[in-house]
Amino acid sequence: MDFRNDDEAWQQIPWKHLWVYDKLILSKKLGYLCGPSGITVPTADEYVVRPITNLQMMSVGASIQRLEPGDHVEPGYFWCQKFTGEHITVDYFYGKQDTTAKGFPREGRLDRFDKWELIDREIPFPEKLGLLWNWMPWINIEMIGGNVIEVHFRYNDDFRNHNGKVIYPVWKDEDLPQPEGSTWYNSPCQDRLGFWVI
């Protein structure tokens, strides 16, 4: 089964694998400090607060919030310890590393990036995810500082239909002039129109 979109995967994969798209369960499986609405944080700090499941533009609705014991997040959301470091996305084909890119997040937002750039770096399939790669051909994993934050039963389509090494997302509510030497790649998704590709 090869999927391009998370909604296709969610509707077709066996229910026993749907935990991958439940970011709270994924975080617990990975041993992170986290909890749903109704469970408060153990210490005052900054945490990532995001929807438990969101199949389109999966960081939509995510934010960094300072929480204290006794604070509650909205129903349907969960809190998780905040990670810092490089934001990396990796495609694996039956566990073998394929397309790997580094994201440059927008300052103050978790759901937008200013650019993505292909990189040449060896990143083994995370052991904590077991043998998922033996069941699904393509698995895309996003990490921050080496910590897995999202898993998708699909490949990263953003780098599939062109030969570019760097892509600049273009958003509906922003004007991004065409960078020198770039070409347009139409790839609409939610509030994204596509990419300038170099």
How does the language model describe each region?
Residues D2-L129, V170-E174:
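Active-site nucleotide/adenylate-binding loops and adjacent lid/helix of ATP-dependent enzymes
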Residues Q56-M58, L110-I198:
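ATP-dependent carboxylate activation and anion-phosphoryl transfer catalytic cores
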